[in-house]
Amino acid sequence: MVKYISILGSTGSIGTSALDVVSAHPEHFKIVGLTANYNIELLEQQIKTFQPRIVSVATKELADTLRTRISTNTKITYGTDGLIAVATHPNSNLVLSSVVGVSGLLPTIEALKAKKDIAIANKETLVAAGHIVTELAKQNGCRLIPVDSEHSAIFQCLNGENNKEIDKLIVTASGGAFRDKTREEMKTLQAKDALKHPNWLMGAKLTIDSATLMNKGFEVMEARWLFDIPYEKIDVMIHKESIIHSLVEFIDGSVIAQLGAPDMRMPIQYAFHYPTRLPSSYEKLNLLEIGSLHFEKPDLEKFPCLQYAYECGKIGGTTPAVLNAANEIANALFLKNEIAFFDIEKTIYKTVEAHHNVKDPSLDAILEADQWARQYANQLLIKKS
């Protein structure tokens, strides 16, 4: 069966890897829609290669510019409405959500309402509104297929298993770019230092989140919703080699793990062709060459953002959306070298502390909390500077 795919975020790290997968298996995958933010040069190349029916960019000006460069019949849209138009296009049956941040929330919700299966790589959508997204998927008979390597690993480990027999999920973490630094050394580190991820090729925002371990915190929150498992049964383990992508421990003491080379094309391909597998030419795992694997507990005093994520997830309501929004603001300013590395965790903590939580929130309440948190975090950092 051919999968007709729309990719939200086609010019990013996940999006370009996904298009590599499509190129490797043109008999199985066809592109219906693509979206980019500002990188219209790369999007132009993608349009010429994959001939999508519809694309979307950030602004009307970019859309107008793109129209002058494209001679195909591809429809060109823009903004949030454009994202939603791509996500809900009637010709697609699978949507890869790989845009960065909470901007993926509305198009994902609309895609589910349009009864599309979602290959989900945008973890912030589940962090901010996991209860809404998972319920919509159930109501509309849609599958949420994880793309993050850790969640894909758990998804594969649970294939054919009974969720009631799970004792715990163990999410692995590389530890990020600063894993071997002390708190004292981390004080003066800049964005260029954090962007040197030891194992994975990722976008800038995600690489900074990896350095703070906030990314791992978001993955814990995502796992809670994807697999309907309480936070008390989700552990994080530092595994510097990034060979074991995650593990599941069952009530009888058995542990199932998923291993593979650190290449995002593998979980993307698995999500695209689920429930069956396709052959690939990607690097095969050779444990004899690797020789040994190492594991350790995360240091929550050194990386408090992971602890914040657990605490905010357990509180629930609008607090996770506030956590995410404050992180997005601080992360972006750190990337511009406008704040110090530790200002990220301080901003998140102060913003969450100031928030008045709303339990069982509507989508509007979540979006309102998101906007409040962005404004509050910005004000904190303006006062600091």
Swiss-Prot record:
Gene3D superfamilies: 1.10.1740.10, NAD(P)-binding Rossmann-like Domain (3.40.50.720). Catalyzes the NADPH-dependent rearrangement and reduction of 1-deoxy-D-xylulose-5-phosphate (DXP) to 2-C-methyl-D-erythritol 4-phosphate (MEP). The gene is dxr1. Its EC number is 1.1.1.267. PANTHER family: 1-DEOXY-D-XYLULOSE 5-PHOSPHATE REDUCTOISOMERASE, 1-DEOXY-D-XYLULOSE 5-PHOSPHATE REDUCTOISOMERASE, CHLOROPLASTIC. Mn(2+) binds at D148, E150, E219. InterPro entries: DXP_reductoisomerase, DXP_reductoisomerase_C, DXP_reductoisomerase_N, DXPR_C, DXPR_C_sf, NAD(P)-bd_dom_sf. This is 1-deoxy-D-xylulose 5-phosphate reductoisomerase 1.
